[in-house]
């Protein structure tokens, strides 16, 4: 059963994770574009009754005015960062679990599984996710937002956007909002890995098999992926505004003061519900994304192991949490 499962070779984790991330991006990136547009929407000045558009209307507007490919704006930045992101996520998660395993029983408790997930989320946020998202959000936000109706495209692609941001604003601009990104990724991955591990263990024991059917893996990935967005939606909304906003007044403030300023401005101008703006497409983006990620990851890893190209690590994985 799962207690006897051998650890995969690091190269297998890298290849399986990268492939899973690529499929996730291709399948779910349009939902992320809609989510970002909803979060950065500004009410039209002087017209109180104008409400921010909803998920379907936002997606339809993007498609009608900018074309189908506009839904994939910023995809280049995601694809460029997806392989190291997934490699860091899965490898760091396994590394932290190894540190937290009970040396006598070989068991990782539920609490320590959550801590390992939190550590993996923080690690990926600092090394990959934040710079990638700054570039992605700039690309997604540069066309036809209500507050900038006549603005032309400033960035041609992900590489050009990254170069322009660093040239005009410095390397530190790529880490704008990193504390919020780290907090978001930490809660996401903590909940994600904990729920996924528990559900996977339950189904493995129920079926008396190590390899679950793909549809079951998708279901538990969907469930685990849906939890995080509800707990940290305000952080994600503030982070998106912070990474898009380049105002001089904000540049003079400390990181925490920027967060407080943007949060207070959101509450004052748009109300409490603005902190949860984009929650629907975010759940629709993250939950199916995790379903795709875990399903593809498990599938590719199993097939790479069966090919026998890489030798498995002889050290067993920590026993499932009890």
UniProtKB/Swiss-Prot annotation:
It comes from the Eukaryota. GO terms for biological process: fumarate transport; succinate transport. It is found in: Mitochondrion inner membrane. Induction: By ethanol or acetate as sole carbon sources. Repressed by glucose. Keywords: Membrane, Mitochondrion, Mitochondrion inner membrane, Repeat, Transmembrane, Transmembrane helix, Transport. It is a multi-pass membrane protein. GO terms for molecular function: succinate:fumarate antiporter activity. The keyword Repressor does not apply. Transports cytoplasmic succinate, derived from isocitrate by the action of isocitrate lyase in the cytosol, into the mitochondrial matrix in exchange for fumarate. Belongs to the mitochondrial carrier (TC 2.A.29) family. This is Succinate/fumarate mitochondrial transporter. It comes from Saccharomyces cerevisiae (strain ATCC 204508 / S288c). The gene is SFC1.
